[in-house]
């Protein structure tokens, strides 16, 4: 960057002429290639793919022809109105209601105001003394499973939800490969045809080979209060997804599957989940590991999918699936958000560029990414040129004005087309982004590097959160969040603290964890080529559809009622315990003991209790119990 800037001759003369000529030649051709080739890729993708919010499936989908879509929505400290708006956007999609199953997962076991308000809006009485950890609700014809899990962060919440989904649909997925899992945020508003357009590209389009593993859609920003910051974000979202991700899609795979809008084939995610959920905070060696797996978890999941895919074009961009998310309102919040994104991006970018398996499978994609990263330091070049003109250090004839005009013209032409096609005319102000965005990007990059983990010249800050024998890695991360800076943490203390706690508590697990064996930046080699095409069932593409429509409630999966002994006394250890809190277990134990005492004092005459309980407790309370449950809409 230094030798290519229009610096004063007194400084530029210090550089060797041969080095200057070579680097200027390299910069020119890098810019030329990265300007024209991706632009042509983008044009090709726009010609061959549909763009817009229009309905693509011409026939009417019903309960028998529509694949099952499981929506995972983690929630933590969200506004009730925002959360219910997100839920409404899902259940009101133009998609058969029996084929949608929403898993609303709260990251925390406490029954707080948010939880009660959400249940009330879903039609569940809020006057009950206690609530089970999992509740099934039928809301506007769509099955919604409301769950509470122990607080552990977004990925831990996703892990618990995935395990629950895996149990609910354990029998169905053994015979079918037509279940898709959609990850969205609790503040996202889905477009009405978002689900069916996703399913169309992944499963139902004519001639579809059904080998698509994952797709991401188009995320746009929305705001109640407009400002220059929200305008720049809106233009950046559109340009970054419809241009950059479209180019990546044309090169073989997108490099980021954002958690705000990503649809995965459930069978593929099921194979990769053990690797994605295996990396825990306690296993992080340093800040690089922490940023890679916990700040850039979306990129890390995409990396695993790129390795697991057996061929190119199995991880793509759906340009007809849209959703809206709230834009950041203040500059301080924007810098904090982009700093987090940058650290997650740069660490996973290193992993991607150093993985030879990706170079072999996606050569064009990795080459484009490599070239983009080599010229990242020129983000401030435009401003330096303007400064050189203002200070008369350089004249207009010495600057590549024509080259800059062509760059602006080609990008602006695309933005004009996107604005007209999507009816988002404010993105026609793209020249404003062309001028201001380089400065913002340069500031995000420099600020993120210099403040990574809030490191000072003497090391971490004195108030940096660290793990010890009494503080777990998760608790240290929560402490950093409460202090207002989630990166003010010392990951180097995670492993020693875990080892110390293991020794103290003597809790050596029998299982062998999934660990890296050769490299700290690459996933395990056993991930390579994990994914294969779906099983084709000739003549019965969606077999057992009635089983899908009338899926049993969670409480009835795998016979959650525990066994009964000879006296009809409930035996502990059933799968229902997994959904009981400590307070529920204590009440259960008291009731269990009281029942045993009553039976011991009762004379042994008349028919045995086994006759009453041989079909389970629901057999004796069929009409009364089930009518009450059905009226409330809860299964537990």
Curated annotation (Swiss-Prot):
Organism: Metarhizium acridum (strain CQMa 102)
Protein name: Chitin synthase VI
Similarity annotation: Belongs to the chitin synthase family. Class VI subfamily.
Residue ranges, annotated region (Disordered): 595-636
Keyword Transferase in annotation: yes
GO cellular component, one term: cell septum
Role: Polymerizes chitin, a structural polymer of the cell wall and septum, by transferring the sugar moiety of UDP-GlcNAc to the non-reducing end of the growing chitin polymer. Contributes to the production of conidia but is the only chitine synthase that does not contribute to the ability of fungal conidia to germinate. Involved in fungal stress tolerances.
EC number(s) given by UniProt: 2.4.1.16
Effect of disrupting the coding gene: Increases fungal sensitivity to heat.
Transmembrane segments: 23-43, 374-394, 399-419, 427-447
UniProt keywords, alphabetically: Cell membrane, Glycosyltransferase, Membrane, Transferase, Transmembrane, Transmembrane helix
Catalytic reactions of this protein: [(1->4)-N-acetyl-beta-D-glucosaminyl](n) + UDP-N-acetyl-alpha-D-glucosamine = [(1->4)-N-acetyl-beta-D-glucosaminyl](n+1) + UDP + H(+)
Primary location: membrane
Domain of life: Eukaryota
Cross-referenced SUPFAM superfamilies: Nucleotide-diphospho-sugar transferases
Enzyme class: transferase
